[in-house]
Amino acid sequence: MPKLRSATSTEGRNMAGARALWRATGVKDNDFGKPIIAISNSFTQFVPGHVHLKDMGSLVAGAIEEAGGIAKEFNTIAVDDGIAMGHGGMLYSLPSRELIADSVEYMVNAHCADALVCISNCDKITPGMLMASLRLNIPVIFVSGGPMEAGKTKLSDKLIKLDLVDAMVAGADERVSDADSEQIERSACPTCGSCSGMFTANSMNCLTEALGLSLPGNGSMLATHADRRELFLEAGRRIMDLATRYYKHDDESALPRNIANFKAFENAMTLDIAMGGSSNTVLHLLAAAQEAEVDFTMDDIDRLSRLVPHLCKVAPATPKYHMEDVHRAGGVMGILGELDRANLLHNDAYHVAGENLAAVLAKYDIAQSDDAAVRKFFSAGPAGIPTTKAFSQDCRWDSVDDDRQQGCIRSREFAFSQEGGLAVLSGNVAVDGCIVKTAGVEVENHTFIGSARVYESQDDAVAGILGGEVVAGDVVVIRYEGPKGGPGMQEMLYPTSYLKSRGLGTQCALITDGRFSGGTSGLSIGHVSPEAAAGGTIGLVQTGDRIEIDIPARSIKLAISDVELAARRTAMEALGNDAWKPLGRVRHVSMALKAYALLATSADKGAVRDTSKLV
């Protein structure tokens, strides 16, 4: 029978000092011997997705203590990618994922916690906590802060739905008046919560449901809705159940590596492709799989992308639907239910909400469940009242959206497309692959041939786009922005937004060894691997080269001869210490980021640390 990890610091005369310190935190005599449950909260006043999380730890702690455990909360950092974007702050976003993972490991192992509740929400926080959970392999459950309500405003007497990307595009579009731009800005992000579309934060919170590590509704229930309170309380109760199963009954199915196994990673990626999730999710799933010691690779993602249809289309791919609409249509369980009926899921995978995924779907998939409470749960809707408070409203839709022909979630027969929302491309530009969010690409752009316009940094690319250097037919190449070359693998939402604002959104392509915000749409190809700083071919592209992109064929090609490519590589290598470095780029890189770059791998490995360098 597994012994409580916390016994290391609570049992025996030699631990008198540790017990004295535990007592100083409020632990009583009759508490010793109970499981100690760590609550990793990511509350911060910097991030709208986290501004309402301050009291969530206490909520979860109360449920844990009622169920017979000891709850101890600590905090992690949380970077807001939207606020950090467009300047040097974005260099810190992806590296913060590793910092969060390490900080969770440090706190849990230093204090011998027995189990873990992860209160996350935004872009790098959920992945960082997921990596730590799978590294630690102790009972865990995730509960996120929930999505923001979609913005709404009237322009030209027409009610429109908005999100962060609309504000960014309008701000850079000279055709939009100052008054309209300000109105969009003030309306785009009305409440607390993670940005309202299928961007990275919401994509990752949805994927925790498919991985089996969070409760139904975690990815879609609005941050403002009163029903979300119960998710936090139930997370506290469930973690005690998981801890009891493992420590008292030796049930290893309660451990995260047995829940998030290969089948679960396939389920999560299948969901991701079906819902057109953020391309960043590929990066994070690959990283999490390595922590779980699961052999899940880009080859698996490529294979699944050819099988899975696009069943749910959400902003930024369409202005019609946001996360509040996904929830009304049955949330993640609604999408998984359709995938299950299409025989595309492993429904025998374990799940924290039930015996296995099949049992959870039987209750929570609105297309098959007749549970009135479940239908009421998915009727939770927005109030349209600006607020930073959680659980501040209890508005409901008149009915759920169970229209699988023309609704937000479709059956396979009526899919938005029979090919999914993400694809892996490869070719001489990206020998180890790259990622495109096909859900956001117009069909006429699925094949594209253009002339390369090369930039050594995101900043130079932005200047080129806004300065009129980039014209229709160009393939904008932004390199040395990968995990090592940036360092930090910046998101390229500003370049893509500015292309749209200049009317070039469907007239140009963009490829980069950096990455894209979940808010990106258009022919935007990221995660090019190997990255330029690691000797990738993208570092050899020259302005004027022809680049051929063919999404149906899953290919991306630099149209020069192998002889010419080899000659360019030889010339680059001849530069010695100056090889594979950006020409003329001026960028201050802090010591912390230099340390990150030393161990960073390219995106096809999830941009995790190359631990072989530590041997």
From Swiss-Prot:
Mg(2+) binds at residues 81, 123-124, 491. [2Fe-2S] cluster binds at residues 122, 195. Functions in the biosynthesis of branched-chain amino acids. Catalyzes the dehydration of (2R,3R)-2,3-dihydroxy-3-methylpentanoate (2,3-dihydroxy-3-methylvalerate) into 2-oxo-3-methylpentanoate (2-oxo-3-methylvalerate) and of (2R)-2,3-dihydroxy-3-methylbutanoate (2,3-dihydroxyisovalerate) into 2-oxo-3-methylbutanoate (2-oxoisovalerate), the penultimate precursor to L-isoleucine and L-valine, respectively. Keywords: 2Fe-2S, Amino-acid biosynthesis, Branched-chain amino acid biosynthesis, Iron, Iron-sulfur, Lyase, Magnesium, Metal-binding. Binds 1 [2Fe-2S] cluster per subunit. This cluster acts as a Lewis acid cofactor. GO terms for cellular component: cytosol. GO terms for biological process: isoleucine biosynthetic process; L-valine biosynthetic process. Its cofactor is [2Fe-2S] cluster; Mg(2+). This is Dihydroxy-acid dehydratase. It holds the Pfam family ILV_EDD_C. Disulfide bonds: none annotated. Homodimer. HAMAP family: IlvD. Belongs to the IlvD/Edd family. It catalyses: (2R)-2,3-dihydroxy-3-methylbutanoate = 3-methyl-2-oxobutanoate + H2O; (2R,3R)-2,3-dihydroxy-3-methylpentanoate = (S)-3-methyl-2-oxopentanoate + H2O. It is an enzyme of class 4 (lyase). Pathway: Amino-acid biosynthesis; L-isoleucine biosynthesis; L-isoleucine from 2-oxobutanoate: step 3/4; Amino-acid biosynthesis; L-valine biosynthesis; L-valine from pyruvate: step 3/4. InterPro entries: Dihydro-acid_dehy_C (IPR042096), DihydroxyA_deHydtase (IPR004404), DiOHA_6PGluconate_deHydtase_CS (IPR020558), ILV_EDD_C (IPR056740), ILV_EDD_N (IPR000581), IlvD/EDD_N (IPR037237).
